[in-house]
Amino acid sequence: MVLDNLGKALANTLKKIARASSVDEALIKELVRDIQRALIQADVNVRLVLQLTREIQRRALEEKPPAGISKKEHIIKIVYEELTKFLGTEAKPIEIKEKPTILLMVGIQGSGKTTTVAKLARYFQKRGYKVGVVCSDTWRPGAYHQLRQLLDRYHIEVFGNPQEKDAIKLAKEGVDYFKSKGVDIIIVDTAGRHKEDKALIEEMKQISNVIHPHEVILVIDGTIGQQAYNQALAFKEATPIGSIIVTKLDGSAKGGGALSAVAATGAPIKFIGTGEKIDDIEPFDPPRFVSRLLGLGDIQGLLEKFKELEKEVEIKEEDIERFLRGKFTLKDMYAQLEAMRKMGPLKQILRMIPGLGYSLPDDVISIGEERLKKFKVIMDSMTEEELLNPEIINYSRIKRIARGSGTSTKDVKELLDQYRQMKKLFKSMNKRQLSRLARRFGM
């Protein structure tokens, strides 16, 4: 989960309010101290923390709850609203108004910028846009090959020339090339910057003046903490920052530094990086993000993941009919596990469900994820005949499958039991129910 430690601390603070027998000034001040402690531990700038919590305390002490709302509920609402305001109030997506829309990506060395360029290209491709990527990073020889490696499999073209040393010329040629190809979006990758490197910042300005981007996007490493504050200011002076993408938030204890950067620049966070895979990027929506952070769930986000999956998976009418007749195979189950994997880490999905929040321990979630991975490995060790006709799997085959997958016979039997339960469930459902379920889980 993004900002996991901060989320747990804030969720526990809200639980303290919810469980209190009554709400008085002392409890409100204790709440404020807990929030301050949680944000400072997440490396949010102290001055910004004090501004935020002063407003929470003022509102909690002065405002009267609307009719039908308890004092506790109103205080939780205040915390939610102020944190949302702190992060930008509302989602501000990148607007694709003109074709081509040109996006210039800038960032500190090691921020994950080049990987983020690939993620963004894939994100827009999945939504029906034709995307071209320009590599104008002449400082890092491997940048062009890295982009090719990430994007070739998705048939997203990358323009670059590892021998060319003029970044401005390369950027201009790349943009002109993709304009002639009629793409919808051109994403221009640049060399990693450092706030002290004036020559590189000057080059960035010159590229901007030549290609005239519709938006300049600053990529910030979520693990650097408060350093993000000063780096964002340095970029603010160098070029108008249209927006921010924060990377590496999935495992960072210092992600709060990114919040400081947003407040410093006044630029909205438009995307966040939530993992290492190319699909691990999501639009940043402050209300939904804060809702998840506080353990309140994100149903809209969950539904969007289902919808995205539906677009990628083709469901055939004959498959639905087959499942209804009880003809559900291990190969179908394998497809289901693959679809679940595409939705993202189990931990991330569970955080979107209201009521679960942080109530499930990480070790329990980890066991669930490991079990799914193990099932997939076991099925990889089966023959095509066994996947299509699981009834032929006797004890001799179970032993062979266990040896081939590096698991135990008990693990293989557990998978087969799970398969039989699913087969029984599908056979008992009507066509409409099964069709809906199949579309959601990629069968």
Curated annotation (Swiss-Prot):
Binding positions (GTP): 107-114, 189-193, 247-250
InterPro entries, per database record: AAA+_ATPase, P-loop_NTPase, Signal_recog_part_SRP54_M_sf, Signal_recog_particl_SRP54_hlx, Signal_recog_particle_SRP54_M, SRP/SRP_N, SRP54, SRP54_GTPase_dom
SMART domains in the cross-refs: AAA, SRP54, SRP54_N
GO cellular component: signal recognition particle
Catalytic activity: GTP + H2O = GDP + phosphate + H(+)
Enzyme Commission code: 3.6.5.4
Main location per the UniProt record: cytoplasm
Biological process annotations from GO: SRP-dependent cotranslational protein targeting to membrane
Alphabetical UniProt keywords: Cytoplasm, GTP-binding, Hydrolase, Nucleotide-binding, Ribonucleoprotein, RNA-binding, Signal recognition particle
GO molecular function, one term: GTP binding
PROSITE patterns: SRP54
Top-level EC class: hydrolase
Localization of this protein: Cytoplasm
One Pfam family, short name: SRP_SPB
Family: Belongs to the GTP-binding SRP family. SRP54 subfamily.
Subunit annotation: Part of the signal recognition particle protein translocation system, which is composed of SRP and FtsY. Archaeal SRP consists of a 7S RNA molecule of 300 nucleotides and two protein subunits: SRP54 and SRP19.
Function field: Involved in targeting and insertion of nascent membrane proteins into the cytoplasmic membrane. Binds to the hydrophobic signal sequence of the ribosome-nascent chain (RNC) as it emerges from the ribosomes. The SRP-RNC complex is then targeted to the cytoplasmic membrane where it interacts with the SRP receptor FtsY.
PANTHER family: SIGNAL RECOGNITION PARTICLE 54K PROTEIN SRP54, SIGNAL RECOGNITION PARTICLE SUBUNIT SRP54
UniProt free text on domains: Composed of three domains: the N-terminal N domain, which is responsible for interactions with the ribosome, the central G domain, which binds GTP, and the C-terminal M domain, which binds the RNA and the signal sequence of the RNC.
Protein name: Signal recognition particle 54 kDa protein
Gene transcribed to yield this protein: srp54
